[in-house]
Amino acid sequence: TARFVNENNASCLFLSATMPNFIKKMLEDEIMPIEFVAPSPSDQSDREILEKKRHNLKICDGDVLTNIADIVAAIKNSNSTLIVCNHVPSAQLVFEEIRKKGVTDAKLLHSRFCRRDRDAIEKTLQERLPKVLVATQVVEVSLDVDFEQGFSEPAPIDAIIQRFGRVNRKGERSPAKVVVFTEQISKYNIYNKDIVSRSITELQSLSNPLREIDLIDVANRVYKCGYSGEDLERYNNALNHPLIKCYKERLIAGFHYDWTEQIIEKTDGTIELLPRCLATKYAEYQAQGLWLESNRLLVPIRAASLSYLSEYLNKNDDPWIIKSYFLAR
């Protein structure tokens, strides 16, 4: 898209809370020289932003479950707490443990809710924060929420920064407690292990309270060599995808084709399934020609997960139907 608008003398604006230097170079290499606007330490108003202190960080050994007693105690002493896990099953386990320990004002948010239900949950969060929200990476994007404290599984620094951004969001309170654990619950890694390790090491070198500029500097140090390994391969595969390379040949005026979503999904390897409890409603929407409404009942699942979900799947239908209790666990 950026290439296309640039070739047609239009403007394109990139906005990001985390823009490591290597990303800037990649954008310039692929498009054209770009004017980057960032807060300047020499400007007083910008300096106030860069020096803003919103968080007190603690790096804690172990994972969320091994520290669940301390987390529950902290939850009971706070009005609102955010816990972010890297995997849906991990978030479900943590949610169940917290409920078992007497915290009833709790919400769960992850990518295995169908779009309809996820939108409903997000709407309730905008109206009132629960005592605790257990979420996955979905909380990093779009949600304008402000928790009093946060706990997170280990992740790359850019993801950590986004998670911190949901705690003491406006910086109007004294620095809030944020805890990052050194281990995750799941044995499966969705992030580059070296990047996660470097992120934790760099965070450990910081002094409290954290300044915004501290986190920007950490992101640049962690990504000083750019992408590598699987991350670089994934980037190149998406960049060289035929839908991007040959977009001019496929361009039809007035026709909308969600090629970006298709590329991302194929790169990430996801497939949309229909929960069995929603099959009747899906059929009703389809019969009425309500295609958008029916699609909002589908749930994205990583293709890599299908190998151990076979007993829950009915592949005779289109879309495939999955037993609902698996998703609700």
Report residues per predicted region.
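C-terminal accessory region of SF2 helicases/translocases
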Residues: 147, 161-164, 170-329
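Loop/turn-to-beta-strand initiation segments
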Residues: 8-14, 80, 129-132
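Conserved RecA-like helicase motor core of SF1/SF2 enzymes
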Residues: 111-119, 129-187
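Short glycine-/polar-rich loops that comprise or flank the Walker A/P-loop
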Residues: 8-10, 51-55, 103-105, 145-148, ...
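Conserved helicase ATPase motor motifs in RecA-like P-loop NTPase domains
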Residues: 1-27
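Interdomain hinge/linker at the junction between the two RecA-like core domains of SF2 helicases
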Residues: 19-76
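Conserved RecA-like helicase motor-core motifs
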Residues: 33-42, 101-117
